[in-house]
Amino acid sequence: MAPPFVFPQILRALEEDPEDNHRLFAQNPVDVTSLRPSDLEEFVKGVSFDLSDRELFCVEDQDVFDRVYSLVRSFFSLPPSCKCNLVESLRSNLSVLLPNVDSISRSVQDQEDDVPIIDRITSHRNALKIYTFFLLTVVMNEESHISSVETTKVAARGRKKQIIQSWNWEPQRGRMLNLIANSLEINLSLLFGSSDLDENYLSFIVKNSFTLFENATILKDAETKDALCRIIGASATKYHYIVQSCASIMHLIHKYDFAVVHIADAVARAESKYSDGTLAVTIIRDIGRTDPKAYVKDTAGADNVGRFLVELADRLPKLMSTNVGVLVPHFGGESYKIRNALVGVLGKLVAKAFNDVEGDMSSKSLRLRTKQAMLEILLERCRDVSAYTRSRVLQVWAELCEEHSVSIGLWNEVASLSAGRLEDKSAIVRKSALNLLIMMLQHNPFGPQLRIASFEATLEQYKRKLNELEPTEHASKESTSDGESCNGDGEIDDLHLETTTKIHQDSLSDSCQPENGEEISEKDVSVPDIGNVEQTKALIASLEAGLRFSKCMSASMPILVQLMASSSATDVENAILLLMRCKQFQIDGAEACLRKILPLAFSQDKSIYEAVENAFISIYIRKNPVDTAKQLLNLAIDSNIGDQAALEFIVNALVSKGEISSSTTSALWDFFCFNINGTTAEQSRGALSILCMAAKSSPRILGSHIQDIIDIGFGRWAKVEPLLARTACTVIQRFSEEDRKKLLLSSGSRLFGILESLITGNWLPENIYYATADKAISAIYMIHPTPETLASTIIKKSLSTVFDVVEQEEAQTDTENNKVDILTPVQVAKLSRFLFAVSHIAMNQLVYIESCIQKIRRQKTKKDKPAAESQNTEENLEATQENNGINAELGLAASDDALLDTLAERAEREIVSGGSVEKNLIGECATFLSKLCRNFSLLQKHPELQASAMLALCRFMIIDASFCESNLQLLFTVVENAPSEVVRSNCTLSLGDLAVRFPNLLEPWTENMYARLRDASVSVRKNAVLVLSHLILNDMMKVKGYIYEMAICIEDDVERISSLAKLFFHELSKKGSNPIYNLLPDILGQLSNRNLERESFCNVMQFLIGSIKKDKQMEALVEKLCNRFSGVTDGKQWEYISYSLSLLTFTEKGIKKLIESFKSYEHALAEDLVTENFRSIINKGKKFAKPELKACIEEFEEKINKFHMEKKEQEETARNAEVHREKTKTMESLAVLSKVKEEPVEEYDEGEGVSDSEIVDPSMEESGDNLVETESEEEPSDSEEEPDSAQCGTAIPRYLNQKTSGDNLIETEPEEEQSDSEPDSAQCGTTNPRSLNRKTSGDNLIETESEEEQSDSEEEPSDSEEEPDSAQCGTTNPRSLNQKTSGGEEGESESKSTESSSSIRRNLRSGSRS
């Protein structure tokens, strides 16, 4: 019997001589690479013959084993035929060996002698191992060889393909691996003595199988992948190789994203084949036990793990539902990818894990509770902190709606959540929310019509039906809620749901049809008999749910309108799709919102335009041409001016593409000509509008109906619908050149008479006249051969009409009082019309002159081109070049152009100013207009006249430079001071036109133009932003130093203005090298000096700095802003500069520049907010800094903190020194006053006597308190002037009794000087006894004095104009000298008190002697 075979670690290990000599090894291997091809082929044939001819166990023989080993060792070098022979021999022997295992088991039952059976089992086991080893080794070696070839040169790659094609390796590989998988699936327990196989054998197979799983190419082969999945499933499940398999699976999942789906397949197959989910459960629990923080670090692994869980939940929903609890804690982890995966898992489980209706009531109840818990988690995750998770939850809900797994009980809650997510700050969440609402509409259980009125009418009917069915005592009760009408899992029964849908589609369809606003009649709604009370209640509950859903969708319409203005293209596209779906289901407000998609046709984003065009086609273009025409003309009728421009753009595109067919055009003509019954004048006008739009791209459309346009457009129907005349004027301008000639020949004079009557007549309403006259004048200048002649006639006729009326009014005036106001309201209206007409004619005359010049130039070019071509032959080429050179030298080539330019300038100048001393017709009107506009008192009485007059004035200014210059002051006066915001707004727009036309004239008025940004009117500010944006972005105006005004508009209270300002700076940042970079320091300085709230300043700077992206600009800004510190001394500006610095993105160079500029801002570090901003910069710098830079930043931080503390200490010391200095001055003044007091005391001692006004200290005599009043009453002064206090020999004690501080010294002096009426107590020879014992704070000395002075002035008014100097009074308050003073040092206080005490004693002695 051969020795046992033991799986080696590597193939070459079989050549090593075993120590125990008790295993099979290769004793005499042959080097087949050294054999000649013929010898090698003979060698392989011999091995194959032995394997096939001899018994299966011959592979144990040493000779056969050595030869097979030799071939396997050098398998990659064998020719294809040899490879194929060897593989076939090994595979066929193993395939025959496997069925013999069953025969062994039968032999065990039949024979009594066990020894031969044991030998046979051993031989079978040995042969199985050897065949398995060699076959799997061949697979691994060949795959290794192929992989190495793929990574080498292109030539080697071609060789690989040749190898594979020559012997077709892939099918061989699949068959070999399937055979190995079969060997594991049969009963091997008899061979290995137990259900667990040999560890060495199983480990070898599993290890190599997982290695093959790492090759994506192998997994693409279905047969190979199936074999590998079977091997892994059998090993882990049947032979309990769980731990090692789980470790290998987790490694594969984390490292190879392509293997995730295949691993999930393998695990799911193992569970289904062996009805044992141990492998899946073990993997789930391993994932659940993993620390959530590990997934934060390994993002790729987290993504793969999440995908695996979702795939597993899809394949094994029931098993996953019972083990999902171990994964739920990961909802609290930081990895959003794992949370996304868990959300996906719950979605799969809700859809698939609870569909089984079998089981007892307790199991059903448990399943329902589990499902409800999962749904609650899904609802809760809609508010996840991560936008990716919120988006994924909404996607899961959409999948559940598609699979009809959302109950009606939850339907409205999900819809409400989704509608709320439409306002999410993340674009991906908004996209998912829009898709969810689209899906909910598409799969809603309430029917195809979701109009609120329909549901309300139906609901009311069934409530009445319920009241009839219920007993009388319950008739007044409310209908049950959703929960009462639902079954155990929160879903309304299918019967009731189907009934609801059928009723809503069938019986309610008639009530949903009216489109003209008719109320739904109760008679139109039939209520079918649906059964008993409970069924009726369930139906009512479902109708109420449908009503709430319809209201929820209708309430989201304003949000969808906002999303259509989003900067994200996906928002716009999906909002349009949702609106289209809403219109399909007749959601209230959807059609009105869809009208607002028209302006999006001008979007530069191609995807948005395509979405708009597709929506337009699907909504308005129908199969029936008449329906299409009716849809289009109704759209034209209801559209405003902006929408009509967009509609024209779309119609042109659709006509060019053929989407609007000729039959639709014919239907539009039928509507215009009233050939369709019931057509109104308004519909006729709408049809003509669409035809006019279509004619822009296809003018031939109008040629066949010229007479109809004149007859109907200006006929009796124009009286009914005045706008029809305006539309007809627009259509005339779209005529082709050929059609214009036809028109002039057939109906020219008639048409011009009609147009003249439109302009000069009075039959058009006031609100329509101006638009109609505009189009009529333009039409005249478009088709008339000499439009200036007709225009002259129109002006004269209009002028005579206006002033003839005035003369008639004057003739009829009899009294003096009636002459005060000649211009009646009728005359004002006519004058306004006249001014509009004459100014519009002047503008069209200017355009007409320019078009004539261009026409002459085109004709000249067209004429010169053939002559130039004929001269440019080879013979005349040299002569032509010589003539051209001579003409160029003489200037003859440019003389024609110069002549045309001169003629054009002269013609333009003659429009308003005239070419001679006498002014022309329009020039006379301009003079009158200029005087009229200066009559402010008249115009203030008639605002509508002022609007027309200023509009006309602006038009004349645009035409003529000299007229513009002479009236600029007037225009800016009106734009600043006019009470009407309409006038100011129009003039603001005109300033933009003037700046384009005459930039040099407007340049000195730049500041005044920027001032319009501060206007109180919203429309004026908005127009100012638009005008300035246009001028600056098109390089028509220099930014100058007023751009900060635009920056302030970023924080405007009106969102529209704020958005326009932001858009301006966004577009400005795209120009050149971003001008905002250069403007930012100036804007910062200007905003710092303005009275702008700190929050507004921060928002403005944050937005502006956010538009600067380049690192070099950021680095330069660091230096610029640091240098601004040295130029300002205000703490507020320091704070603003430092805040702006903190908004910058700091690179390594930026940090270094900040550190190098320390001297520039060190003086500002005393401010706490400045220091905080620098600390913010430091904290940001630490996050990205390298170790070397981080050390510098930390050192810089210490320096900042140190200087901040030093500056704070210096400020404190300076304040204390100032206090001390003021205290010293006060004490010195006390000493001087005491010395002054000594002189009168000494004179008294010599016998001069006591002054009548002198008093003794109140503390020495009790009767002294009332002395002042007594003496002042007895001896009043006759002097008119206030006596100097020095004459009274006393001082004002309240000035000497205070604690002083230098903090507010400057502020106090004016306050003292203002007390002119305050009496000096020295005048009466007394002091204020109340002030003698008062202790006051030195910080508020002056404030206290001023308060006392004010109170004294109220009590004792004085006629004195001058306040006496207290220093001249010869007395002080004795008690005040012993008070404590603040801010002084102890030694100085003692010296001062000693000095003061001697004077006190002298005063006391003098008082006692008296």
Curated annotation (Swiss-Prot):
Pfam families, A to Z: Cnd1, Cnd1_N
GO biological process per UniProt: cell division; chromatin organization; mitotic cell cycle; mitotic chromosome condensation
Disruption phenotype: Homozygous mutants are not viable. Heterozygous mutants exhibit a reduced fertility. Non-structural maintenance of chromosomes condensing subunit. During meiosis, elongated chromosome at metaphase I, stretched centromeric DNA at metaphase I as well as a slight reduction in crossover formation. Reduced expression of stress-responsive genes in the root tip in response to stress treatment.
InterPro entries with a match to the protein in the record: ARM-like, ARM-type_fold, CND1/NCAPD3, Cnd1_C, Condensin_cplx_su1, Condensin_cplx_su1_N
Compositional bias segments (type: Acidic residues): 1240-1284, 1306-1319, 1342-1365
Residue spans of biased composition, Polar residues class: 869-879, 1323-1339, 1368-1379
Tissues showing expression: Present in buds.
Subcellular compartments: Chromosome; Nucleus
Residue ranges of the region described as Disordered: 469-492, 504-525, 860-879, 1208-1410
Statement: the UniProt record of this protein carries the keyword Repeat: no
Entry function: Essential protein. Regulatory subunit of the condensin complex, a complex required for conversion of interphase chromatin into mitotic-like condense chromosomes. The condensin complex probably introduces positive supercoils into relaxed DNA in the presence of type I topoisomerases and converts nicked DNA into positive knotted forms in the presence of type II topoisomerases. Required for fertility, growth and euchromatin organization, but not for sister chromatid cohesion.
Record protein name field: Condensin-1 complex subunit CAP-D2
Taxonomic source organism: Arabidopsis thaliana (Mouse-ear cress)
Classification lineage: Eukaryota, Viridiplantae, Streptophyta, Embryophyta, Tracheophyta
